[in-house]
Amino acid sequence: SPDGKKIIFTSTRNGDLDLYTMNLDGSDVRQITTELGYDGGAWFSPDSKKIVWRASRPTTDEDVKVYKELYAQGLVMPTQMEVFVANADGSDAKQITRIGKANWAPNFTPDGKHIIFASNHEYERGFPFNLYLMKLDGNGVTKISHDGGFDAFPAFSPDGKKFIFSSNRNNGGTHATNLFICDWIL
């Protein structure tokens, strides 16, 4: 966490992929998600009071069956993921996207007022992935990258002035993924 007190992580220790927090020394481990499904990719807000993550939650009996069969093999099928926010202790959890496909790699903007995430929701074939910005309640989804490939894993410099993301743009057809850094001016 930005306040230097907690770590957030995904673990299978309870028989499902859930989020946990703990102190930096490994003490006070607490499970903070409990619904069946694949919870992961969590980040704390800049003030350490909120968390954001992506989850794939099976909803139908068939989805649950497939999820459990894959999980038993140590696999997941993260093709349908949505973005969630909660208090840092996991309370008041809310799904804030309902746009379908894979919405993942969410992170808070430096001011804590928006969430940036990767998604393929606009594309029939599930590709490309671009970056989108939205308010904390999921409203105002705005596309901020316009590449025909893969843009994901948004992050910010500690001072909030630089924006960093991974992309396979400009790779000469090699499928290499590189880091890109630019000024953040929101």
Question: What does each model-found stretch correspond to?
Answer:
Residues S1-L186:
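Sequence signature of WD/YWTD-type beta-propeller architectures
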